[in-house]
Amino acid sequence: MFTQTMPDKRWNVFEVKLDGSGFKQLIHNEEPDLEFYDGTYLPDGRIIANSNIGYQGVPCVSGDDPVGNMVLYTPDTKNLRRLTFDQDANWNPVVMNNGRVMYTRWEYTDLTHYYSRIVMNMNPDGTEQKALYGSGSMFPNSTFDIQPLPGHGSAFVGIISGHHGIARSGRLIVFDPAKARKGAAGMVQEIPYRNRPIVEEIKAVSYTHLRAHETRHDL
């Protein structure tokens, strides 16, 4: 399963076999402005994906960047239901070993700062949305591309990075929320290192944020 644009330039979720055959579009919806990406199968064959279904934009860039919220799609009936109603983006839903779905959420109203991307989890129907790792913590700033460790009850792997900079590029970390759910306390190992302590990195940095129609300084 992967994401690419359709002939009309909208994003959608597709599937292809390893030998290149069986290419097909997975989500079919008649709404002309809806787009879909970051899809994943549920065990029962339904699909969870991100979508611009809220028709909203990121506040700190004047709404220029679309916000994605998660939807649940049933291929047999083409029924589409919205699962999250967040102000800012969700990313990378994936089924955990316990059957719940974990994902990254841009938590704009978190306890510590407005640019935290924390790891969340929920039931496949969108109920019981809860923080799994990083809520109320200054470190890590963002955690992307999370995947559960096969055969483990709670551990997962993800890339930690900052708010600005190279998108989704950073340090590959193994987490175990059963040990702790904030800071470096629940980080088991940084890959590819072994027996190397993980030290929290928290810095205060000023930068100039310029757009074609703006001149301002953010701290």
Residue ranges of predicted features:
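Beta-rich catalytic cores
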Residues: K9, E35-Y37, P66, A89, ...
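Conserved small/polar residues in nucleotide/adenosyl-binding loops
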Residues: T208-T215
